[in-house]
Amino acid sequence: MMTTLQNKEECGKGPKRIFAPPAQKSYSLLPCSPNSPKEETPGISSPETEARISLPKASLKKKEEKATMKNVPSREQEKKRKAQINKQAEKKEKEKSSLTNAEFEEIVQIVLQKSLQECLGMGSGLDFAETSCAQPVVSTQSDKEPGITASATDTDNANGEEVPHTQEISVSWEGEAAPEIRTSKLGQPDPAPSKKKSNRLTLSKRKKEAHEKVEKTQGGHEHRQEDRLKKTVQDHSQIRDQQKGEISGFGQCLVWVQCSFPNCGKWRRLCGNIDPSVLPDNWSCDQNTDVQYNRCDIPEETWTGLESDVAYASYIPGSIIWAKQYGYPWWPGMIESDPDLGEYFLFTSHLDSLPSKYHVTFFGETVSRAWIPVNMLKNFQELSLELSVMKKRRNDCSQKLGVALMMAQEAEQISIQERVNLFGFWSRFNGSNSNGERKDLQLSGLNSPGSCLEKKEKEEELEKEEGEKTDPILPIRKRVKIQTQKTKPRGLGGDAGTADGRGRTLQRKIMKRSLGRKSTAPPAPRMGRKEGQGNSDSDQPGPKKKFKAPQSKALAASFSEGKEVRTVPKNLGLSACKGACPSSAKEEPRHREPLTQEAGSVPLEDEASSDLDLEQLMEDVGRELGQSGELQHSNSDGEDFPVALFGK
């Protein structure tokens, strides 16, 4: 028993002593990976060492199995994530492959800016411009998959080696789409390549369709312009017809008439076919054609317009009137809108509500129009009687005026709207243009109804001259003629030469002033004899010599306001002169007009020298008149010969 126990103890102690050294323990624990080659210790063949070595291997296998069990769900999750990411990428590519409205508008604007020739000739430049507008589609899996990194858990790479990423660049075959740049790993299939190709084809087709649409829009714009021109040419007559109704002013206004009763005074709106110029002055509400507002007790019709839109006009387009221009007779016409301005009345200022001028189209053979002031217009019914009297006196223009009257009476029988359409400027102007009688005489003296007006002016002047010659009430014309005669003044005594010279200068000045001012003052130095009788001064009696000194002073004093200047006819004697002096005193103010400034320069000695005997002076004048035979023969036609007499 003792021997067996000792042997057991020795057997139990034996292996303990063998594995005691630390070098062997560290050596036995060295292999840590299953792939490393197994190293066997020489000389060790006991089962305990094999059991101990097998323990770490089992633990490592268990760990690997656990790791593989953990990696299985993670790989499935990664596959699901990849599938979702690929789907999202495909959706984004589809969205980006289809043009948005903003991109399409930008492309259309760029193409419209370029001309059609550049678009056809430079296709490459156009494609480049389009690709510059398109946004590049870039899909990188490294960016879209932030959770996936290169690791040893990849199914295709069991050894844990990383594979470098490669770039695949796919450009459309037409070069029209933007380049799509994406990164992928080796071994991964491209997601849905057929869909991408179809998307690229649809992109190119869409852009081609966009080009065609742009070209169609440009071509259609040109065709539209041509069609518009054709339509304007075709519808020109229709536009003119509309202008006759609208631009002529007929459709522009609403006519209101005020009741003449002072207790009423309401404004009533008239229908479109009523001419307000034909209405009487005592118009009242019961004369209104509108049944709803034909009594004074009915309230006034409401109107929502502004007061600034109201014009207190007496005529409307279509009113027949008589128009008068300066130097021409009254002529029948019709109120109508100006074809250039589109208005039929004008104001002197924008603050006025009463028109100052109306546009008139004259009746007659010639088509003429003009802007006539209000004070040169009359109603057609007012001047008919006066015109009949005028026709008796003037027969030269009766034919043309008769044609105009016939036309006015014909226009008076129809409504206002038809009147404007038939007798308006455009309709008559086109008719005269087709007949070769196109004469537009506006805003000038030539817009008179006929050429016979000049003859009328000449006849009026001749009639005036004849009336002035035959009419005894007009003595001014005679005096003007007397002033125009160049009669030489006569002097008195030895100073005849000096008086003659001074008289001539004064006569010229006075004549110029009297003609300029139309005054009838005769020249002062009318007393005396002609040059043929200037040498008979020595034969005159003594009292005439006393008048030598006062005569020179009286020449200046004769134009003063305090002196009287009277005209005496040559056939009258001394007694006739005395009787004619009071009657001619009424004409004294006319002779005071010229040279009124010289009145203050007359000295008082002139008044003293003028206190001579008037009777003696008149006797001397009678003797001179009796001796001058030549003067009687020259003035035998009966004209007055003025003699200046001076006195208080």
Curated annotation (Swiss-Prot):
Keyword Zinc-finger applies: yes
Function according to Swiss-Prot or TrEMBL: Dual histone methylation reader specific for PRDM9-catalyzed histone marks (H3K4me3 and H3K36me3). Facilitates the repair of PRDM9-induced meiotic double-strand breaks (DSBs). Essential for male fertility and spermatogenesis. Required for meiosis prophase I progression in male but not in female germ cells.
Modified residues (Phosphoserine): 636
Name of the protein this chain belongs to: Zinc finger CW-type PWWP domain protein 1
Bias (Basic residues): 194-208, 505-516
Coiled coil: 74-109
Gene: ZCWPW1
Tissue specificity annotation: Testis.
Organism of origin: Homo sapiens
Top-rank taxon, per record: Eukaryota
Gene Ontology molecular-function annotations: histone H3K4me3 reader activity; histone reader activity; methylated histone binding; zinc ion binding
Acidic residues bias spans: 604-618
Start-end of CW-type zinc fingers: 250-304
GO CC terms, sorted: chromosome; nucleus
Outcome (variant: residue 303 to A): Reduced histone H3K4me3 binding but no effect on non-methylated histone H3K4 binding
